[in-house]
């Protein structure tokens, strides 16, 4: 364990006296462990991505009372776009030469001890050097009072995980292997040869050398979708069918290898690893890559190719389409618990309307099926023709209206909008495709119907970029800070920069609001188990008998107002409605209607003499 109480001095404390690690006597080693436990509990701890270290310390029996500072989160508060690893931070905040290649991981034990002590010293030095930048940007309170609350929140997510229904999982594996074999046979019938859909070389040779289709730079999903979108790109229907089956088979095989065959943790639960510091403010999840968990030999022969990582990424379990729903169905809460999902309703769209000062749109979104209404602008008809409430399912036209609206919010052009729509439709098996002409016409109608999005929101964001290339996000409710998260943009001037900047404020506002709500809910309901944070939604496991108490409180916290007063685009406060769903697995979630309990007669306010004699209709 590396310790440093001063940036000029550090030490490494061996925790074992076996395998030539140290020659410390057992009695002294026991005293050292007691002293370390006291230091970790009593002192303010500074670390780099300290949730990783804390997990290892917890498994050794050590407890941390308080993380005083985390240089990874501090780097995120200062510059979300720059790398946040210790090596990079050392290079820009200290004069310490690069030392990671001096045998720390490949050399002798002494080299490892020296490297560990150096890590401790430079972490402390970096933390002190960052304070000036933190104060200059005015985000110290935001960092201390909000960002530093996130490690505890995400540590619980990583520790909880899903229970896996083995019988459902086995049935899904059988279903998807049959699906994969069927697609292989159908593709062989069309092409006349066996082609591995995951081999880009084989797919490239078939499409461009054998079939002479218009050449693309690659054969990934985006390139093949663009090829299918060309008016005269794929003229022969069997060729089109083969490409679509190729894309479908890739998704099926990824589902088998990455999700259905994922390795649970030692207690049988499926867990994930959270990364809190994407440049937009959002989080991502991934497998439990080493050294978080060791690789598992799935065959037992000791071959490197048979080694597999534990866990899986949770946030990719989309509820759209059949594949996402299938994967969700095998995940369940512990016995006696049910899942409660809190989902902010059309959150990013509401933030965009507020930033565009479009009060009519904020009113209409509560009174209409807004995606169906948007679809009627583009494709004719009326809202009820495509309404999800009327039809009972999502119409392909409604899906197109929703996707094109999101493209319009973020200033996308016709090509990007059509490619995104066709890619998503194919992924979720929604029977609709459009070409650039339809997308261009739809975007023109959209901006004519809602001109304030371009004239106010887009214009004001670009003006902020012209001033200092900096945007300040709104502030979640209950955070003691002057301003929200700050991002400095380094992309070169142009459409890519504008697209990133337009997406930042809505995404950061929504994700910070969700995280802050989750922290408040956990503080008030410590027995509820947080399973997942997914940008605009939270998933909890709650005891069945506590549902009536938990849901009204959680819904209230999710609907707290977001503060836009010190945002780069100052606006009024905004409340985002929250939909509540419950279920016994992650797929079959249904709406939960909060019961309204009338006030008992003895608690009601007594009527006046006049009210008692008035006629009640």
Model-derived regions, located:
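Conserved "right-hand" nucleotidyltransferase catalytic core of DNA-directed polymerases
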Residues: 1-19, 81, 92-93, 98-101, ...
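C-terminal structured "cap/appendage" subdomains that terminate the fold
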Residues: 524-579
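Short active-site loop/helix that positions an aromatic residue
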Residues: 51-62, 75-78, 132, 204-211, ...
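Conserved RNase H-like, two-metal-ion catalytic cores of nucleic-acid enzymes
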Residues: 1-88, 92, 300-302, 319, ...
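Short, contiguous acidic/charged loop-to-helix segments that flank catalytic cores in large enzymes
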Residues: 20-23, 259-265, 275-278, 295-298, ...
């Amino acid at each position: 364990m590396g310790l440093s109480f001063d940036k000029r001095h550090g030490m490494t404390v061996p925790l074992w006296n076996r395998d030539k690690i140290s020659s410390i006597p057992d009695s002294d080693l026991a005293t050292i462990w007691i002293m370390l436990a006291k230091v970790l509990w009593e002192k303010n701890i500074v670390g780099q991505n300290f949730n990783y270290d804390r997990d290892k310390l917890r498994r050794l029996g050590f407890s941390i009372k308080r993380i005083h500072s985390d240089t990874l989160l501090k780097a995120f508060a200062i510059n979300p776009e720059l790398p946040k690893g210790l090596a990079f931070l050392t290079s820009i905040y200290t004069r310490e030469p690069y030392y990671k290649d001096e045998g720390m991981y490949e050399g002798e034990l002494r080299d490892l001890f020296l490297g560990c002590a150096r890590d401790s010293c430079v972490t402390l030095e970096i933390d002190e050097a960052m304070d000036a930048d933190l104060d200059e940007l005015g985000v110290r309170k935001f960092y201390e009072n909000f960002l530093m609350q996130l490690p505890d929140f995400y540590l619980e997510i990583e520790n909880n995980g899903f229970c896996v229904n083995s019988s459902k999982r086995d049935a899904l594996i059988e279903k998807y292997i049959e699906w994969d074999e069927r697609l292989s046979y159908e593709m062989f019938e069309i092409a006349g040869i066996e082609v591995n859909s995951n081999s880009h070389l084989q797919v490239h040779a078939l499409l461009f050398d054998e079939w002479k289709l218009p050449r693309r730079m690659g054969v990934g999903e985006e390139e093949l979708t663009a090829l299918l979108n060309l008016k005269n790109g794929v003229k022969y229907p069997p060729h089109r069918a083969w490409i679509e089956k190729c894309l479908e088979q890739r998704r099926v095989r990824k589902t088998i290898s990455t999700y259905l065959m994922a390795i649970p943790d030692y207690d049988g639960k499926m867990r994930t690893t959270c990364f809190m510091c994407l440049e937009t403010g959002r989080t991502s999840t991934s497998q439990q890559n080493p050294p978080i968990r060791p690789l598992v030999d799935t065959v037992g022969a000791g071959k490197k190719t048979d080694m597999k990582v534990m866990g899986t990424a949770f946030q990719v379990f989309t509820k759209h389409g059949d594949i996402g729903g299938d994967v969700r169905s095998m995940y369940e809460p512990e016995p006696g618990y049910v899942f409660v999902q809190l989902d902010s309703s059309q959150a990013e769209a509401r933030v965009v309307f507020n930033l565009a000062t479009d009060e009519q749109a904020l009113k209409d979104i509560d009174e209409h099926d807004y995606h169906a209404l948007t679809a009627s602008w583009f494709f004719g008809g009326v809202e009820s023709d495509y309404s999800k409430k009327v039809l009972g399912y999502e119409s392909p036209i409604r899906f197109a209206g929703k996707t094109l609206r999101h493209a319009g919010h973020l200033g996308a052009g016709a090509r990007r909008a059509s490619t995104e729509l066709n890619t998503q439709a194919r992924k979720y098996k929604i029977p609709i495709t459009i070409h650039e002409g339809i997308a261009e016409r739809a975007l023109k109608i959209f901006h004519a119907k809602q001109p304030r999005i371009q004239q106010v929101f887009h214009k004001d964001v670009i003006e902020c970029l012209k001033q200092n290339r900096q945007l300040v996000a709104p502030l979640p409710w209950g955070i003691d800070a002057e301003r929200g998260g700050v991002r400095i943009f380094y992309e070169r001037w142009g459409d890519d920069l504008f697209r990133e900047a337009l997406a930042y404020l809505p995404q950061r506002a929504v994700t910070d609001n969700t995280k802050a709500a989750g922290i408040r809910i956990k503080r008030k309901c410590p027995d509820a188990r947080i399973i997942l944070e997914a940008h605009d939604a939270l998933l909890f496991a709650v005891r069945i008998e506590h549902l009536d108490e938990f849901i009204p409180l959680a819904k209230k916290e999710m609907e707290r107002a977001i503060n836009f007063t010190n945002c780069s685009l100052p606006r009024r406060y905004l409340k985002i409605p929250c939909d509540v769903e419950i279920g016994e697995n992650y797929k079959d979630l249904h709406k939960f209607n909060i019961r309204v309990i009338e006030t008992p007669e003895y608690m009601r306010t007594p009527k006046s003499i006049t009210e008692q004699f008035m006629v009640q209709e």
